[in-house]
């Protein structure tokens, strides 16, 4: 009987370590080895903006999307994200204006001011894409956010790949395992 109890406790202990370890490894792998393909649309996930000026995190995402646009990997860029109560601008509008000032045509920079989190923002842009009968997208976000963002998009019916940022406060060069843990 004691042997059976010890085996059961060992299995529970193994599960406690293995399950979070599996998810941690999935997030880490997606951050370090992204699969990015061309698409008609890129979606820049929202991040803070300060009175219309993108935060460092949002600017890094916008730069990556602009790079994809310049290289011909995407034809249009969607920015998403609502504003906080009292904000004069939304994350989406601040991002769109940044892209336009860099040379992206107004028709190619689309603002969807929906969502203060990944799920709500994803629902907003997926609804927009479905109206256009588009089902593929490249998501531009932080490396450790890629797995979550692509998983939610796929769950909502869109084929998604991720183009993680290479610089910025949440990029891989910061080597932040703390951040990795918070995005699992």
What are these regions (language model features)?
Residues 2-34:
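N-terminal type II signal-anchor transmembrane helix
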Residues 177-181:
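Conserved small/polar residues in nucleotide/adenosyl-binding loops
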Residues 24-174:
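A structural signal for short, hydrophobic/glycine-enriched beta-strand patches
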């Amino acid at each position: 009987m004691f042997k059976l109890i010890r085996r059961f406790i060992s299995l529970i202990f193994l599960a406690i370590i293995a399950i979070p370890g599996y998810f941690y490894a999935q997030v880490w792998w997606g951050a370090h080895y992204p699969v990015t393909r061309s698409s008609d649309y890129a979606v820049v996930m929202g991040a803070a903006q300060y009175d219309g000026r993108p935060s460092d995190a949002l600017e890094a995402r916008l730069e990556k999307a602009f790079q994809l646009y310049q290289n011909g990997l995407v034809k249009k860029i969607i920015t998403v994200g609502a504003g906080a109560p009292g904000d004069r601008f939304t994350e989406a509008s601040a991002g769109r204006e940044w892209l336009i000032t860099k040379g992206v045509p107004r028709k190619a920079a689309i603002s969807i001011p929906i969502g203060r989190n990944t799920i709500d923002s994803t629902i907003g842009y997926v609804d927009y894409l479905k109206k256009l009968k588009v089902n593929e997208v490249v998501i531009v976000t932080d490396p450790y956010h890629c797995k979550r963002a692509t998983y939610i998009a796929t769950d909502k019916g869109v084929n998604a790949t991720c183009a993680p940022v290479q610089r910025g406060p949440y990029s891989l060069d910061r080597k932040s395992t703390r951040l990795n843990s918070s995005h699992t």
